[in-house]
Amino acid sequence: MNFELTSAYKPTGDQPEAIAQLTEGVLEGVPAQTLLGVTGSGKTFTIANVIANINKPTLILSHNKTLAAQLYSEFKGFFPNNAVEYYVSYYDYYQPEAYLPSSDTYIEKDLAINDEIDKLRLAATSALLSGRKDVVVVSSVSCIYGMGNPSDFYNNVIEIERGRTINRNVFLRRLVDSLYMRNDIELNRGNFRVKGDTVDIYLAYSDNLLRVTFWGDEIDGIEEVDPVSGVTIAPFEAYKIYPANLFMTTKEATLRAIHEIEDDLTKQVAYFESIGKEYEAKRLYERVTYDMEMIRELGHCSGIENYSRYFDGRAAGTRPYCLLDFFPDDFLIVIDESHVSVPQIRAMYGGDRARKINLVEYGFRLPAAMDNRPLKFEEFESMAKQVIYVSATPADYELVQSEGIVVEQVIRPTGLLDPVIEVRPSLNQIDDLMEEIQIRIEKEERVLVTTLTKRMAEELTEYLLNNNVRCNYIHSDVDTLERVKIMDDLRQGVYDVLIGVNLLREGLDLPEVSLVAILDADKEGFLRSHRSLTQTAGRAARNVNGMVIMYADKITDSMRLTIDETNRRREKQLAYNEEHGITPQQIKKARNLSVFGNGAETEDTQKGTRAYVEPSSPNIAADPVVQYMSKAQLEKSMERTRKLMQEAAKKLEFIEAAQYRDELLKMEDLMKEKWPG
């Protein structure tokens, strides 16, 4: 089946050209391309069109679960008749196993698995192994973490067909081998029940039952059934039943693994004893021996993933299987916000290894535990045959990989332009800033001011307050929740000016802000680098009157790059607007986005054409898991979101904190709706 793009929107601006260039590059086998798209230019819609054109299975990689949920919702809307799947970490809570030698503290692994996300992960792998091409998997960095061998998973797929002869008991044993459990009383996901000649299977990757009826040893009927009402949804002539777990193995593989583990245990114990680590040798022997007894008796043990290399039959040091192994050879990877996502992929292996080294050196785990890991960055690169990097400010890595193939998308469907940038002398900069602030206050617009130090932010705030300017400051010393509230108060008009040091991060969306003032813009450093200045200037791009003032005594290379690039984009945007008779439209963003919002529409009053505008922030209802949560699960998720909000604010990631805050409000509303009182 081919991809079928369903949308009321038409490509506008430079979207058609971007779509054509990216499509041509993929079809010609170009290994890496970069889509440099400004905020609000409809990058997601462009990628959806490319996917429809190339008709290849596609992995969309996002750097966090919240944004992945938003992308999942958008692509689900674009491709309602195709397989759009969601693959993120299935842990509601996860405390990894660790050992701290300095305090002789061993931290045992603790976790809580979200059943709904587990279902969605299985649905993703099942869709990929079904052989269909029209599959989009939206994933977090979880896609590079170890999982079961796809060959073992596929070998346990049960293919059935009406009229085929198969002994019912043989069929039931095959279900058990695929890790389905018989439960004739309560039928839950991953279970099956038997009533006479009827076998009901609650598929592990679906919300429906599969009912298989026998006539003797012949399959008489196959149909999907609603698990609550029992009403038939659809009959089938043939069906593939995919396993109930991603980690499949056989009895033979288990026995072989136990033998190899015990051999390696003997060697490692002898090694510890040879270097005088008697206590570590004893600890390792006891722990591994206990694990082997558990595997022999029950088929599993706590921390069995640390023995995954033996079950997979891999050699020491080889990479684990991961989601990328479930894709066919010819597939596309799209890395969203690549300037953040790529460094995250690069960092995963190092963080995992640093934790496990202590576990191995102090006798808690065999050295094979080091092979239960995420992919190294080089391994990921070797598997990523075709990549599109998507970012407003791509890093040097993406540009080098793309070898100059950078597709620009700088025209916004709203007609909004990049802000005007002015450079003014730092002499009397505060007095000049005061005048500019008063102009904005009269227009009921907002101002952002960025300083170099916390002390400067506080002193400037005090000065402005003494001059009757409603303002506040944000930095790491301000209480976590208070920071998020201040951001919201700025939008609501409680404050007219917000002062900060590093508050102007990627994705900070404040349409009311028409002026961004950068003090000491000529002081080179990470806060005044080309990318930082570009991101900072972009905070004024959501307002029709957007303007940036850089206060400096000289123009640095970073300033020059930012100014030249912004002016180049403005010229292109202005020319397009004039050619097509478009008047820039101010974005009107509600304080809290609609729970069911899937994007915004803008009406070009001159042309009457509809254009797709990217949603300005993720919404929690986009996450397919939340609607199915029990009250206890929702309460736990709310507590986790609250902690994430606090952590994000602590790290000065205010846009993330605001997104988590919005999630929390939505979950509170959902709680009141489902369980009033």
Swiss-Prot record:
Domain Helicase ATP-binding: 24-412
Signal peptide (UniProt feature, chain positions): none
Entries under Pfam families matching the protein: Helicase_C (PF00271), ResIII (PF04851), UvrB (PF12344), UvrB_inter (PF17757)
GO cellular component annotations of the record: cytoplasm; excinuclease repair complex
Subcellular location: Cytoplasm
Coiled-coil regions listed in the entry: none
Domain Helicase C-terminal, first and last residues per copy: 429-591
Domain of life of the organism encoding this protein: Bacteria
Stretches assigned to the UVR domain: 635-670
Keywords from the UniProt entry: ATP-binding, Cytoplasm, DNA damage, DNA excision, DNA repair, Excision nuclease, Nucleotide-binding, SOS response
Residue span of motif Beta-hairpin: 90-113
Predominant cellular place of this UniProt entry's protein: cytoplasm
InterPro entries (UniProt xref): Helicase/UvrB_N, Helicase_ATP-bd, Helicase_C-like, P-loop_NTPase, UVR_dom, UVR_dom_sf, UvrB, UvrB_inter
UniProt keyword Nucleotide-binding present: yes
PANTHER family documented for this protein: UVRABC SYSTEM PROTEIN B (PTHR24029:SF0)
Family to which the UniProt record says this protein belongs: Belongs to the UvrB family.
Domain comment, as recorded: The beta-hairpin motif is involved in DNA binding.
Function: The UvrABC repair system catalyzes the recognition and processing of DNA lesions. A damage recognition complex composed of 2 UvrA and 2 UvrB subunits scans DNA for abnormalities. Upon binding of the UvrA(2)B(2) complex to a putative damaged site, the DNA wraps around one UvrB monomer. DNA wrap is dependent on ATP binding by UvrB and probably causes local melting of the DNA helix, facilitating insertion of UvrB beta-hairpin between the DNA strands. Then UvrB probes one DNA strand for the presence of a lesion.
Protein name as annotated: UvrABC system protein B
